């Protein structure tokens, strides 16, 4: 039997919403350090479509790597082939964010939020300081171009602690 302890790091408001689902195997935290303190050793750290929405994706990646989880899986994350981080504005409909229908009383409307495309070479170099990249996969080809350069190819990295 394998017991899984799932510690989710999210925004404060998402943590508050998640408290209703909290039990022995699922907990919500608003910081990496508080999740790690509660959990102790971490076998697998998963980040899915999150780094690009952090105010400083590289600093957040460094914080994730410092956890020293046995394995890290970075998935659904767009990277830039250039040498500098490209920051843009992403738009979506409110209903496209989160599972299920909009709560009663909410109006579906366009929302705007910042998104960062960090240089893939910089990310790989940071990872390789502490981890071995076991595989890297192109999950979704670029569909956004600036001056004929792809800026958002989505990659996945599965990494093992050295």
Located regions from the model:
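A short acidic, Gly/Pro-enriched loop at the edge of an enzyme's catalytic core
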Residues: 33-45
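Short alpha-helix
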Residues: 109-139, 152-156
């Amino acid at each position: 039997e394998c017991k899984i302890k799932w510690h989710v790091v999210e925004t404060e408001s998402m943590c508050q919403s998640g408290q209703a689902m909290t039990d022995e195997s699922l907990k919500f935290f608003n910081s990496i350090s508080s999740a790690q303190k509660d959990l102790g050793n971490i076998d697998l750290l998963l980040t899915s479509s999150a780094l690009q929405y952090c105010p400083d994706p590289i600093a957040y990646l460094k914080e994730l790597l410092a956890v020293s989880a046995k394995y890290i899986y970075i998935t659904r994350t767009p990277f830039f082939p250039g040498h500098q981080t490209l920051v843009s504005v992403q738009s979506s409909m409110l209903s496209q964010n989160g599972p299920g229908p909009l709560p009663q009383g909410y109006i579906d409307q366009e929302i705007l939020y910042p998104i960062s495309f960090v240089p893939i070479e910089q990310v790989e170099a940071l990872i390789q300081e502490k981890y071995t990249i076991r595989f890297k996969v192109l999950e979704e080809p670029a569909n956004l171009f600036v001056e004929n350069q792809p800026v958002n190819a989505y990659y996945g990295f599965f990494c093992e602690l050295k």
